[in-house]
Amino acid sequence: MKKLFLIIGAPGSGKTTDASMIAANDDKFAHYSTGDLLRAEVASGSELGKLIDSFISKGNLVPLEVVVNTIISAIRSSDKNYILIDGYPRSEEQMRELDRVLASQSEVKLDGVIEVDVSEEVARNRVLGRARGADDNNEVFNNRMKVYLDPIKEIRAFYNDKKILHMINGERTIETIVADMKNLIENLIKG
């Protein structure tokens, strides 16, 4: 059975960097972001990829069920047994659909949800300081923060009730955060 770990956090929390560093330094882990998975499925030319492309090419959102099926498909086809996915779920609907799909199969088990916790001020400084793209301005940051914050209480409560939510302080050095997250994941794997 494959073990899935979801890494969540505010924009600028470092969740993508943390997860990619763990996977880069330990080859038993695979790391995916939802956007990468959708693009890879399109590139594969599969039926699912063609369906995804029919939405993306028109600038439409990919339906929830398709996104979750893409995630599960990628996990199943991965040659790794430990999967890190960052930035998912972003809504209550995404969370509930993933939970529904995971409950209906026995190949993948969600072993942990790790939230990289940073203050809004730290997140803002990181995002506006890095200025990676056109979307890294104050107005867009505020919107992204709202999108993150609106469902987070429900997401935390849901995974807390399942006893799989873990918080990591994201306001330390990257080395410390990654080491902490890796230790936490290793302990969860051991059970």
Curated annotation (Swiss-Prot):
Residues 129-135 are annotated as: LID. Catalyzes the reversible transfer of the terminal phosphate group between ATP and AMP. Plays an important role in cellular energy homeostasis and in adenine nucleotide metabolism. Residues 33-62 are annotated as: NMP. InterPro entries: Adenylat/UMP-CMP_kin, Adenylat_kinase_CS, P-loop_NTPase. Keywords: ATP-binding, Cytoplasm, Kinase, Nucleotide biosynthesis, Nucleotide-binding, Transferase. It comes from Campylobacter fetus subsp. fetus (strain 82-40). ATP binds at residues 12-17, 130, 172. AMP binds at residues 34, 39, 60-62, 87-90, 94, 132, 144. Pathway: Purine metabolism; AMP biosynthesis via salvage pathway; AMP from ADP: step 1/1. It catalyses: AMP + ATP = 2 ADP. Monomer. The gene is adk. It is found in: Cytoplasm. Consists of three domains, a large central CORE domain and two small peripheral domains, NMPbind and LID, which undergo movements during catalysis. The LID domain closes over the site of phosphoryl transfer upon ATP binding. Assembling and dissambling the active center during each catalytic cycle provides an effective means to prevent ATP hydrolysis. Belongs to the adenylate kinase family. This is Adenylate kinase. GO terms for biological process: AMP salvage. GO terms for molecular function: adenylate kinase activity; ATP binding. Pfam families: ADK (PF00406).
